[in-house]
Amino acid sequence: MYDLIVLGGGPAGYNAAERAAHKGLKTLVLEGRALGGVCLNEGCVPTKTLLYSAKIFDYTKHGDAYGVKCEGSSLDHAFVVGRKNKVVKQLTGGIAMQLKSAGADVISEFGIIKGRDAEGFTVEAAGKEYKGARLLICTGSDALVPPIEGLRESVAGGFAMTNREILDMETVPERLTVIGGGVIGLEMASYFCSAGSQVTVVEMLDHIAGPTDGEISKILLKNYQKKGVNFILGAKVTKVGEGKVVYEKDGKAESVEADKVLVSIGRRAHTQGIGLENVGVLTERGAIVTDEYCRTSVPGIWAAGDVNGKSMLAHTAYREGEVAVANMLGGKERVNYLSIPSVIYTNPEVASVGETSESVKAKGIEAKTASVTLKYSGRYVAENEGGDGIVKLIVDKEHNRLIGVHMIGNYASEIIYGAAMMVEKEMRVDDVKKFVFPHPTVCEVIREAMFMI
């Protein structure tokens, strides 16, 4: 009999299991694939490994502006993929060691919830049953493959791919068409453009990067176009196959030729086939319904990570797993989704937290904004010839509180956590003005912007 059974060994699952085991709960993790989930095996870490190689290669192409001569540099894609695999293997091994050290049991099988009785929940894995007083569902998400004519056949035949397959592609395609201009699509477009592909992104919306603040999105688009990525916006893909992607734009059918196609229009919670119906867990649009305490509709069952369909970010999953464990032990911790930062690891990087200009307008929030060039930072100027990065602040007029911060430029991913804390703690502009930021850094532009709002 276990105190806690965790279904899924991704960021939410393995982190929660480690925390629970350290707190004295007899814990079992059931994971049918590799520990680390999508993030470590086919998402966050693999893509960042590829993108770092691309960033170094891009620097060699523009080294002349900094007095560095790098004639004849090239990117060895096969080597990059091999290094990616080594990084993933090292980190998955680390997770296994962490769980073992914490005292959590791990079984490399998928778990299916069979039912509940007076003792707790029954979960089956590979024909064997396990009992748990509590359940934490962290089964993650799957890449969405929409019902576009020819798409499923193209995926089966290898012409089209999801994020899982493209990360292991052995060669760089001459022409890559990306369906979807969200985070995954943009990051892969960035890498393969650097690697030598002729990249075209087809996006149904009239902008890229989804809910990213519009001003930031436009700057990112400009940088991508300058790099050589072609964008077809406001277009709906209608057919995939025979070496091309057919789309409809402004009422006209057009097409773009491709050697490979990446499908990246989003993800859906993995809730099918795990036995939710056997215990009555409520779902909505395929995702498990949870509250801010990570509770499901069934007492004794919590859910964390992509499976709840909320944020679908690994760092959100970490926190949700921790909140679930704390609350199953009597705590009252909650997840504040508005203060969770997001990052697009392109070159330049994009990082955001809180409200955008579009969201405050939609919610009717009286807000004021300030957009400040990163050229106020001496370090940014020293490291960026012709850089167009900015930081944008959004402040509610009534209380003069910081409710949104958005950046595009070097180090944005490493700076945004500080802005997230400001938003989380509902800091006022005058409070932040009193902070002393190190100089010369890029982050000090946030403080400078406070004096301009």
Task: List each language-model region with its residue ranges.
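Beta1/beta-strand and adjacent pyrophosphate-binding region of the FAD-binding site
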Residues: 1-12, 172-182
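Core beta-strand elements of the Rossmann-like FAD/NAD(P) dinucleotide-binding domain
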Residues: 1-2, 125-134, 251-260, 297
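A structured beta-alpha segment of the ubiquitous adenosine-cofactor-binding alpha/beta core
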Residues: 125-128, 236-237, 243, 247-255, ...
